UniProtKB/Swiss-Prot annotation:
UniProt pathway: Pyrimidine metabolism; CTP biosynthesis via de novo pathway; UDP from UMP (UMPK route): step 1/1
A GO CC term assigned to this protein in UniProt: cytoplasm
Protein name (database record): Uridylate kinase
Any single GO BP term: 'de novo' CTP biosynthetic process
GO molecular function, one term: ATP binding
Gene that this sequence comes from: pyrH
Length: 255
C-alpha cells in the first residue's frame, strides 16, 4: 500500500461508523465493456445493476472507488478498422461507447444511494464533467464514485492503458482489473479448461510471456511506476469487496 494510502487510515462510512478494514483505501476498478453487454451488443441492465451493487458495498465500507469502463459492447476501434473503417474515427466511436456505459453505471449507482460523477476526456458538458484529476480526487475524498469515460481522449490508446494512467494520476493503491475469468492463466482457459491459474506474477513476466490479460502498454506503465494490478472474476458476486479486502482471489501482478 502506498504511503498516501497508509496516511488515509481506516475510513468512516456514510453513517459515521468505522468501515470494514480493507487492504486498499483508493482503488481504480477497470471494467470490460463486453461484460456490460452480457456478450451481446448493447447493455445488459441486470449485469450493470449487479456491478453497481458490488461497488456500492465497498463504498459504504469507506473505500474510495474510481472506475474506467471499456466500450466493447458497442464498438471496438481495432475491429472496425479491420472492416475497413479509418482507425482514428473508429477509436473515437469506441470512446463514445465508453461514455454510454459510464452513464448507465452512474444511474444504477445513484439508485443504490451512491453519489457518482462521470468525467470524460472529451468535453461533453451536458452529460459529464471534463476530466480534471484534482477534482476527481476531491470527489473521491467526499465519498463519491468517479467514472472516467471516453478513454484517454486519444486514438490508439486502450481503456486498459487509460485505467493504468488514471490510477497513477489519482494516487490509487491498485488497479482492480475485472474480467470474465478467474485471473491470469498460462493458457486461454476458454480453449484449455485445464489451464493453470497463476496466483502471483510480475509485470515483466506478463509482458515477456505474452499473456493476454491486458495490453502491454498498460502493464509497462504499471511496472515502471510500481502500480500493482489484481486480475479477478467480476461475475462472482462479492468479488469486488473480496479484492478490496485483500482476500486471495485472482492474480496479483506486482513489480
Amino acid at each position: 500500500m502506498s504511503a498516501a494510502a497508509a496516511g488515509r487510515g481506516e475510513r468512516l462510512n456514510h453513517a459515521g461508523n468505522p468501515g470494514h478494514r480493507s487492504k486498499y483505501s483508493r482503488v481504480l476498478l477497470k471494467l470490460g465493456g463486453e461484460m456490460f453487454g452480457g456478450g451481446q451488443v448493447g447493455l445488459d441492465l441486470d449485469v450493470v445493476a449487479q456491478v453497481a451493487r458490488q461497488i456500492a458495498e465497498v463504498v459504504r465500507g469507506g473505500v474510495q472507488v474510481a472506475v474506467v469502463i471499456g466500450g466493447g459492447n458497442f464498438f471496438r476501434g481495432a475491429q472496425l478498422q479491420q472492416r475497413g473503417m479509418e482507425r482514428t474515427r473508429s477509436d473515437y466511436m469506441g470512446m463514445l461507447g465508453t461514455v454510454m456505459n459510464s452513464l448507465a453505471l452512474q444511474d444504477f449507482l445513484e439508485k443504490e444511494g451512491i453519489a457518482t460523477r462521470v468525467q470524460t476526456a472529451i468535453t461533453m458538458g451536458q452529460v459529464a464533467e471534463p476530466y480534471l484529476p484534482l477534482r476527481a480526487v476531491r470527489h473521491l475524498e467526499k465519498g463519491r464514485v468517479v467514472i472516467f469515460g471516453a478513454g484517454m481522449g486519444l486514438p490508439y490508446f486502450s481503456t486498459d492503458t487509460t485505467a493504468a494512467q488514471r490510477a497513477l494520476e489519482i494516487g490509487a493503491d491498485v488497479v482492480l482489473m475485472a474480467k470474465a475469468v478467474d485471473g491470469v492463466f498460462v493458457e486461454d482457459p476458454r480453449v484449455n479448461p485445464e489451464a493453470e491459474l497463476l496466483t502471483a506474477i510480475s509485470h515483466r513476466e506478463v509482458i515477456d510471456r505474452g499473456l493476454r490479460v491486458a495490453d502491454a502498454t498498460a502493464f509497462s506503465l504499471c511496472m515502471d511506476n510500481g502500480m500493482p494490478i489484481l486480475v479477478f472474476n467480476l461475475l462472482t458476486n462479492g468479488n469486488i469487496a473480496r479484492a478490496v479486502a485483500g482476500e486471495k482471489i485472482g492474480t496479483l501482478v506486482t513489480t
